[in-house]
């Protein structure tokens, strides 16, 4: 995730049958290339369950579901306490600039 960008994401129905944004994976690419129609939610999600479970157990990124927004890659990795302090300082700075 840390090395991903918004261009690495897409909105797809391949995983669940409902449109959702995630990182492009081999699984999504393969399913989207099928000529058959995908199943509606929740059937598509249920049918892909065993594969997703096996991929999680094997830590196989090609078949993992990696839901992600367009802000992927913009996060800052730090301890939670440091994050709260940083966000509080940023909010205070923005508030003082606005008021």
Locate predicted features.
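Conserved active-site-proximal phosphate/metal-binding subdomains
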Residues: 1-99
């Amino acid at each position: 995730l840390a090395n991903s960008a918004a261009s690495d994401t897409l909105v797809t129905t391949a995983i669940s049958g409902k449109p959702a944004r995630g990182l492009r994976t081999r699984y999504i690419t393969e399913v989207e290339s099928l000529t058959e129609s995908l199943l509606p939610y929740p059937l598509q999600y249920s049918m892909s369950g065993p594969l997703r479970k096996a991929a999680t157990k094997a830590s196989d990124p090609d078949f993992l579901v990696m839901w992600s927004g367009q802000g992927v890659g913009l996060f800052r990795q730090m301890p939670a306490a440091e994050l709260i302090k940083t966000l509080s300082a940023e909010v205070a700075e923005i508030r003082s600039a606005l008021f």
